[in-house]
């Protein structure tokens, strides 16, 4: 299912209702709270915040790289090393798959690394979001998620 930006706004508003309906299912069968590495395009903050809100209402613990104080101020090799550590640390990997994120080299790099770490465990997913014209690029390989 591909979401439009308008539909994402509607879902954000409905997250409170979803939260109440799913309070009893906030933990996985292991009894641990879900933790999610959230990959996203940095200039698409609005979409990221809405997706993060929905996941937090479902009681997931979220990692967003630009909120991490240990990140270097300028993108570098150490940036990639920290991202790799965080992808390994968090239980699940979700790409906020906007058209911009699909075009982003960093998002694709993160998706590739996340795939290597999480795919066999079934703990990787896309959160596809189309612009309101319902045009979502996607890539053929993204169909496996």
Give a label for each model feature.
Residues 1-90:
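Conserved N-terminal substructure of TIR/SEFIR domains
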Residues 2-14, 56, 76-145:
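Cross-kingdom TIR/SEFIR domain
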């Amino acid at each position: 299912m591909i979401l439009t930006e308008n539909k994402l706004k509607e879902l954000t508003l409905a997250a409170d209702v979803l939260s109440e309906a799913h309070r009893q299912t906030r933990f996985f069968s292991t009894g641990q709270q879900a933790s999610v590495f959230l990959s996203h395009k940095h200039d698409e903050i609005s979409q990221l915040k809405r997706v993060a809100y929905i996941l937090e209402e479902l009681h997931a613990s979220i990692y967003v790289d630009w909120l991490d104080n240990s990140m270097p101020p300028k993108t570098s090799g150490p940036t990639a090393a920290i991202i790799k550590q965080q992808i390994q640390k968090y239980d699940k990997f979700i790409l906020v798959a906007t058209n911009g994120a699909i075009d982003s080299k960093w998002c694709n790099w993160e998706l590739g690394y996340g795939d290597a770490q999480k795919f066999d465990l079934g703990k990787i997913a896309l959160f596809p979001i189309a612009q309101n014209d319902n045009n979502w690029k996607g890539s053929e390989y993204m169909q496996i998620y």
